[in-house]
Amino acid sequence: MPPNIYRLSFFSSLLCFFFIPCFSLDQQGQALLSWKSQLNISGDAFSSWHVADTSPCNWVGVKCNRRGEVSEIQLKGMDLQGSLPVTSLRSLKSLTSLTLSSLNLTGVIPKEIGDFTELELLDLSDNSLSGDIPVEIFRLKKLKTLSLNTNNLEGHIPMEIGNLSGLVELMLFDNKLSGEIPRSIGELKNLQVLRAGGNKNLRGELPWEIGNCENLVMLGLAETSLSGKLPASIGNLKRVQTIAIYTSLLSGPIPDEIGYCTELQNLYLYQNSISGSIPTTIGGLKKLQSLLLWQNNLVGKIPTELGNCPELWLIDFSENLLTGTIPRSFGKLENLQELQLSVNQISGTIPEELTNCTKLTHLEIDNNLITGEIPSLMSNLRSLTMFFAWQNKLTGNIPQSLSQCRELQAIDLSYNSLSGSIPKEIFGLRNLTKLLLLSNDLSGFIPPDIGNCTNLYRLRLNGNRLAGSIPSEIGNLKNLNFVDISENRLVGSIPPAISGCESLEFLDLHTNSLSGSLLGTTLPKSLKFIDFSDNALSSTLPPGIGLLTELTKLNLAKNRLSGEIPREISTCRSLQLLNLGENDFSGEIPDELGQIPSLAISLNLSCNRFVGEIPSRFSDLKNLGVLDVSHNQLTGNLNVLTDLQNLVSLNISYNDFSGDLPNTPFFRRLPLSDLASNRGLYISNAISTRPDPTTRNSSVVRLTILILVVVTAVLVLMAVYTLVRARAAGKQLLGEEIDSWEVTLYQKLDFSIDDIVKNLTSANVIGTGSSGVVYRITIPSGESLAVKKMWSKEESGAFNSEIKTLGSIRHRNIVRLLGWCSNRNLKLLFYDYLPNGSLSSRLHGAGKGGCVDWEARYDVVLGVAHALAYLHHDCLPTIIHGDVKAMNVLLGPHFEPYLADFGLARTISGYPNTGIDLAKPTNRPPMAGSYGYMAPEHASMQRITEKSDVYSYGVVLLEVLTGKHPLDPDLPGGAHLVKWVRDHLAEKKDPSRLLDPRLDGRTDSIMHEMLQTLAVAFLCVSNKANERPLMKDVVAMLTEIRHIDVGRSETEKIKAGGCGSKEPQQFMSNEKIINSHGSSNCSFAFSDDSV
């Protein structure tokens, strides 16, 4: 190569070398790539970010200003799995907008975020950021939008937030923030949106200064622990459109100044403890669209002025204490779509003017005192989908015009005094899924037109005076799942066409006058519950019964069925209860009955004509609790029954059994009435009474006395300690400033804080518990209150739980919370004073003597069962009590039970048809409850469910039956009550020996009840939660125990040979029993609570 050419080539290469930096990525791009390198990126989200580019301005998610400086970064919806890039991006001095949302970022927000002084928008929402909000953020004077919502941020909202004078939007919702809303919030004059809801530990009052935020459009503080009154300054928010502070702890009245919020469209204050009346000034809000005030403690009348809000489409005042009538002015609300006034004390009639609301879709006025007739002009409501008016005092006919509401999906008019027939036109409603008319005075026939209602899912017509036959057209209802037409005057046969109801699971036709054969009737295979009892059905039981493999309960008692029991019944593998009593069955009892392993509740074959011996396979019915084969012609011995370890009730009377009665404690303690009229049966003298307690060994007596002395001494020392502590606390209280108390009353009570404080002395202590000490205090009106003072001023969890739970539920067997008050040092709860103490004190304490007889004990445990069933099955979401024990069952003036102490109560987020899976794993809960009553899953830290309450209730049942505390020191070897009972039954000892000696001398029928209740208790205390019954099933079993042969005297039973008449019931009384449903944070969708 010539020298000149060589030199030219060299200098060209050298020139290119020195000019390479001019075409490389600038410092901003390198900073972005540095952050990118720290992320765990999947996919091609950053495929446009090339190192070969000279500038990042064309990269996805990056924008630059005119000078080529990065001004905006916007990245959303990627799984980056890294930390915030603040350190890496320090060079981006011109950054005005930083959006890093839904990127799965972790770690804390770095303090260096405050260095980006040009930022106007900072959005770090929907990540997994933790730690406190750094105060350095509030150095960003130009910030207009701050979105930190949906993270795991903790700590307080810094007072320095007031420095952001230009802030327009502040989004802090769905974090773990605590403390109070700082008063400096009032410095944000330009703020339009404030959302900080979903922070459960955000507490204190809404500061008065919030009224300074006059540009506010949206105020969202829902699902927090904000308490106290809404400040009157809220009336300064002239531009606010939505106020959402629901599911919190607000108290006091709604300020009249709310009427100055003239732009308000949505007011959501439900699920609080707001009291007073609904302000009439709300009627001046011409733009108001949604008004949700349900589940508070509002009183007084519904303001007629609300009829002046022309845009209103949703009103919900349910679960309050409202009185008066439904305002006629509501008829002016042409846009009204939903009116929900359930569970109040509203009286008067349904105003006809309401039918002018032609857009109405939901009309829910159930659980009130509404009288009169249903307006015939209901036909105007062509958009109506739900009409609930159950548990009122409505009279007259169901208007035929209701059938013109073509969109109706659910009608519930139960528990009224409606008469006349069911309009056949109702069944022309093709969208109707639920028709509930139970417990009225309806008559006439079920029209054949029912077959047109093809979407019907639930039908309840029970407790009326309906006559005629069941129309065969019912077979057209392919979606029908639940049918209850019991306690009417129906005649004729069960239509074979019912086999067409292929989705049917529950069929109850008991107490009618149905007749005819079952042979031609093929029942749907989907059935789980059948009750045809107390009718006049004849013929044999068809072999097809074995096709019902899902069946759990079959009751055919009190009919005229004959022939043999088909052996195919053994294929009903899920059967738990079988009642064929009081029929005309004959032949031998099939051996196949012993092949049904699930048969655990009851097997009743009494009052038939069975012959032969008890099948040998009956020895396999290990879980059976009740067996009744009385009033038959059975022979042989009873040895096959000796292995039934769970058997607590057996009636073999009026047969021809022979041989020796098995020599086991259970058989020795059977009442003679359950063995009577078996001529060949040899009954030894050992079947008489318990051993005389005076024959006990004297050393045992001395040991017992010693234990009692020691226990008494311990109790005295504990009492002294409690009284001293109470006196010291009382002295401290007297020094408190009266004006520092926050007070909320749910009932009208006339007293001052001083009236309470000065009486919190040791002389007034009536009890202590895990969460506090309880005093009896008489207020100036002469009324006595029970006042609970929480133990620890720092521990507010139990206090908040009790307010949250008891403040939102009402049930006849749950203690009533009258109000509460608190200050910095103390928290007090006010309850009705119940004069008879607790169930525990009556069973074990110095006050024992009342509530000792079985009848009173039964009423107590049934009442508690109703309370728990209400919490578990009527409340939405389900409420777990968490500390069911005899000490927490209080007794009223007539020993009526009240479940108390909800300091450990919690809700569970699972409910049928919500799409929430209860089986999904959750964080294991901490230990809770009381030792001796806790279910086994507490000790193993398994998931706590409502079945844990069932176990605790079972322990209470055993305590009531045996008279022994769960940790009674007299139990052998220091055993727990459940283990002692379980061992006793496993050893085949006489179950009646388990019963409280104070219950001795009761009649055979009462003894039978007690032993059946023992069987229920044994089911409840199963070690496996999934084997325990639901509380609604416990209620059903206990009710069934008491209702067997109710109303018939012993003399009548003996005259009838122990079996009832086979004649069908022709008439039933017009008098109806109406269950009192409590009000709560529960679904009041329907009046029925059947399985």
UniProtKB/Swiss-Prot annotation:
Per the record, the similarity remark reads: Belongs to the protein kinase superfamily. Ser/Thr protein kinase family.
Q: How does it sit in the membrane?
A: Single-pass type I membrane protein
Subcellular location as annotated: Cell membrane
Q: Which species does the entry assign this protein to? A: Arabidopsis thaliana (Mouse-ear cress)
Any idea what this protein is called? LRR receptor-like serine/threonine-protein kinase RGI3
Phosphotyrosine occurs at which residues? 831, 870, 933
Residues forming the Protein kinase domain are 760-1046
Position of sequence motif Small peptide recognition: 173-174, 195-198, 218-223, 246, 268-270, 316-319, 338-340, 386-390, 412-415, 434-438, 458-460
Q: Which SMART domains match?
A: LRR_SD22, LRR_TYP, S_TKc
Q: Which reaction does it catalyse?
A: L-seryl-[protein] + ATP = O-phospho-L-seryl-[protein] + ADP + H(+); L-threonyl-[protein] + ATP = O-phospho-L-threonyl-[protein] + ADP + H(+)
Q: Which gene encodes it?
A: RGI3
Keyword entries, A-Z: ATP-binding, Cell membrane, Disulfide bond, Glycoprotein, Kinase, Leucine-rich repeat, Membrane, Nucleotide-binding, Phosphoprotein, Receptor, Repeat, Serine/threonine-protein kinase, Signal, Transferase, Transmembrane, Transmembrane helix, Ubl conjugation
Q: Which residues bind ATP?
A: 766-774, 788
- Topological domain ranges for the Extracellular compartment: 25-703
Q: Which residues lie on this side of the membrane: Cytoplasmic?
A: 725-1091
Which PANTHER family does the entry link to? LEUCINE RICH REPEAT FAMILY PROTEIN, EXPRESSED, RECEPTOR-LIKE PROTEIN KINASE 2 ISOFORM X2
